[in-house]
A protein has these predicted regions:
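Short beta-strand-loop/turn "lid" adjacent to the catalytic site in phosphate-handling enzymes
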Residues: 18, 41-77, 105-109, 136, ...
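N-terminal glycine/serine-rich phosphate-binding loop of ATP-dependent small-molecule kinases
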Residues: 1-72, 100, 128, 200-210, ...
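Glycine-rich beta-strand-to-loop/alpha-helix junction loops that act as flexible
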Residues: 55-58, 188-190, 236-239, 377-385
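Short glycine-rich phosphate-binding loop at a beta-alpha junction
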Residues: 46-56, 131, 184, 370-382
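Structured loop/turn residues at beta-strand edges in well-structured enzyme cores
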Residues: 3, 47, 180, 229, ...
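A conserved helix-loop-beta module that forms one wall/lid of the active-site cleft
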Residues: 175-190, 415
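Short alpha-helix plus adjacent loop in nuclease-associated cores
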Residues: 75-94
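Active-site core segments that coordinate phosphate-bearing ligands/cofactors
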Residues: 90-102, 113-146, 159-161, 165-166, ...
Length: 447
């Protein structure tokens, strides 16, 4: 048995300004999703569509009113409304107590911080809301009408009590967040309904909708060689999530609040360190395109190897989170720290890739300390696994071999989860064999 991927549709996801905030263009996203589903129906010809399942980034959400209508469309975590959080609500709860409750890294982008900001500045929207749904949940809801979230999203939101496994209603009340808006949590991947949407492609009518693969990083972990405990995995896309499987929750051993304990499908847990990822180079490319300089990520990766610049930036510095011009911020950082200033795109690429690799070296040390595991390899998945230069630098800075692939880890993990739910795959052992039979893994980057 093996999996064959065929891309039906691909589109850009961009941030727009709405009411003075950085928001996702939800109407555009919906339009493109349904276009993609229609194309998939056409591409499969007479073959039956067995199921549909959605994965997305975590944290961001929309609000439904009591009539079930989306009245508050998703705002991006890159909006400045959570600036200073969670430290600014320390009078309500300290960061130490917060971590003890949910085991999530202290970060301003979490759903909790966004909702706290709304409670302070937009309370009317929260009182009007009937249910909160995360991005992939909204897609599922639009397809089948079921307002349900899944375990992977809930544990990432900073609102699940890690000891009880339920929504932390006491915490929500402290923050001024109405607990009535928190949806039912689906802890086991399963069919939650069938597609029943006006105007949908006829082939999709009554097709099962599967929930359980919400958080993209969590579902990407299904593509990792999890039969080998001494392999760490790095999901490297816009964000970078470096993690490993964790057999039990033990908050007492974690003294670093940049570590998160996140739920994975089928009740598993993972220890994760998060970092900015390819966002830095993505924003540089966007700025170059605006200025008429056209390049590709593959070309930048190749040319970075020929650049002689050795400057290093602190990739998680706040200045790089949502700048107007990423290239200017990198130049200014190098000036301020007395380093060589990048000039050509290849120089910027080398600075970014080297700096990311150095950061991952720091994070792997943290992960080894907390997990008690000395990792023998790192498996890099998602888009960054295609970047040979970056993967070689990761191996160099981390000091252990790097395995790369699959590049489309989230899509593949999503398909694997559906296949398990629909009884196409029996268990984890069969899943592992199918992954190994289906995809090429490069084990060529050694420190």
């Amino acid at each position: 048995n093996c999996i064959t991927l065929q891309e039906a549709h691909r589109f850009q996801n961009t941030i727009i300004q709405r009411d003075g905030m950085k928001c996702w263009d939800w109407d555009y996203l919906e339009h493109e999703i349904y276009k993609g589903l229609a194309k998939a129906c056409q591409d499969t010809g007479d073959e039956k569509i067995e199921s549909v399942c959605c994965s997305s980034w975590s944290q961001d959400f929309g609000l439904l009113n009591n009539a079930g209508e989306l009245f508050y469309k998703p705002v991006s975590y890159r909006d400045g409304r959570t600036q200073g959080l969670p430290y600014n609500f320390s009078k309500t709860i300290t960061t130490q107590d917060l971590f003890k409750r949910n085991g999530s890294a202290i970060s301003p982008i979490t759903s909790l911080c966004q909702l706290y900001s709304m409670a302070q500045n937009e309370p009317g929207y929260l009182h009007r809301a009937g249910k909160l749904l995360f991005i992939a949940d909204l897609v599922n809801y639009n397809l089948c009408g079921e307002a349900i979230t899944d375990w992977t999203f809930a544990t990432a939101s900073q609102m699940i009590n890690i000891r009880t496994g339920e929504w932390d209603v006491e915490l929500a009340d402290k923050m001024g967040i109405p607990s009535k808006i928190l949806p039912r949590v689906n802890k086991t991947p399963q069919v939650i309904g069938r597609i029943d949407r006006p105007g949908i492609h006829p082939k999709l009518k009554d097709v099962p909708v599967v929930s359980g693969a919400g958080h993209d990083t969590a579902v990407a972990s299904l593509t990792v060689f999890n039969d080998q405990e001494k392999i760490a995995f790095l999901s490297l896309g816009t964000w970078a999530m470096l993690g490993c499987y964790d057999k039990e929750i033990n908050l007492s051993r974690i003294d670093d609040h940049s570590i998160s304990i996140l739920g994975l499908p089928w009740g598993r847990w993972g220890l994760f360190c998060s970092s900015v990822g390819l966002w830095l180079i993505q924003e540089c490319v966007r700025k170059w395109e605006q200025n008429g300089i056209h390049t590709s990520y593959n070309e930048l990766a190749k040319r970075a190897a020929d650049s002689r610049i050795n400057s290093i930036i602190a990739v998680n510095d706040e200045r790089f989170f949502s700048p107007v011009d990423m290239t200017k911020e990198i130049v200014n950082y190098c000036k301020e720290t007395g380093q060589v200033i990048p000039g050509e795109p290849a120089d910027f690429a080398k600075v970014i890739f080297d700096s990311l690799a150095k950061e991952f070296g720091i994070l792997i040390e943290k992960l080894e300390k907390i997990s008690g595991v000395r990792f023998e390899k790192i498996q890099v998945v998602s888009g960054g696994s295609r970047n040979k230069y970056l993967c070689s630098k990761i191996s160099e800075f981390v000091g252990i071999p790097v395995i790369t692939g699959p590049a489309e880890a989230t899509s593949i993990g999503n398909i694997i989860l559906q296949a398990r739910v629909m009884n196409v795959l029996k268990d984890e052992e069969e899943t592992g064999e199918v992954i190994k039979n289906s995809f090429s893994f490069i084990d060529a980057f050694e420190s």
